[in-house]
Design a protein with these regions (language model features):
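Extracellular ectodomain surface segments
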Residues: 1-60, 124-206
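Acidic, turn/loop-rich segments in luminal/extracellular domains of secretory-pathway
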Residues: 49-120, 197-217
Length: 217
């Protein structure tokens, strides 16, 4: 078996690899080696039809992608974006598959270990909205519901802060689940960016920007 680094799609050959340490062998020099079964580690075997290659072989879904292998030992592994997006930049994860090798008489098994290298995936910032009574103050504390002095109570789509709102349509997100989202700049529409200090909040060292009808901190 072999270990390969893979981002996106990766192809290889478990029988005729160029690495001597990973090459499958048979003491019977005249025997022809073929892959007859494949499974994800811990799963059930699926048969691999004779005469197949990685283009028309048997596909098995792993944790982070799908491996397709032929009887000739050739295989292709395609990472699934949704599954692999949670692997952060600089981190890695493995998908392990077990294949059965046959010479027509005897069989043995070995592993294919695919190492998926994480990358910094694009995060998504959603537009946010606030509603306020004239002459009042709207406060959206970190992780809390918005509230406004006066008779208006902002709930639903206007609840929560800009990172962690209760409305999924307004919630900012990052596929790299181990990353921490922070606000780094703020500006009024059409204005210039002002830096937001790390560790600040709206009521402690936050950045104030004056808009057309009021000031946002």
């Amino acid at each position: 078996g072999s270990t390969y680094n893979a981002t996106g799609e990766h192809s290889g050959d478990v029988i005729n690899t160029t690495s001597g340490n990973h090459q499958d062998r048979d003491e019977d020099a005249s025997a022809t080696l073929t892959v007859t079964q494949i499974k994800k580690n811990g799963g059930s075997n699926s048969s691999v039809s004779s005469g197949t290659t990685n283009s028309n072989g048997t596909s098995v879904t792993g944790t982070y992608g799908t491996l397709t292998i032929g009887a000739d030992g050739s295989y292709t592994y395609a990472a699934t974006a949704d599954a692999a997006d949670g692997i952060a930049d600089g981190e890695s994860a493995t998908d392990v598959f077990v294949y059965t090798l046959s010479d027509g008489t005897d069989t043995t098994t070995a592993n294919i270990t695919i190492t998926i290298l994480g990358q910094n995936d694009a995060l998504t910032a959603q537009n946010d909205e606030g509603v306020i009574m004239e002459g009042s103050t709207l406060t959206v504390a970190n992780g809390s519901n918005a509230n406004v002095s006066g008779s208006y109570d902002a709930t639903g789509e206007h609840s929560g802060d800009v990172l962690d709102t209760t409305s999924s349509s307004h919630k900012d997100s990052d596929p790299d689940t181990s990353d921490t989202l922070t606000i780094t700049h703020i500006k009024k529409d059409g204005g210039s960016n002002s830096a937001v200090s790390s560790g600040s909040s709206y009521n402690s060292s936050g950045t104030a920007v004056t808009g057309a009808y009021g000031t946002l901190t």
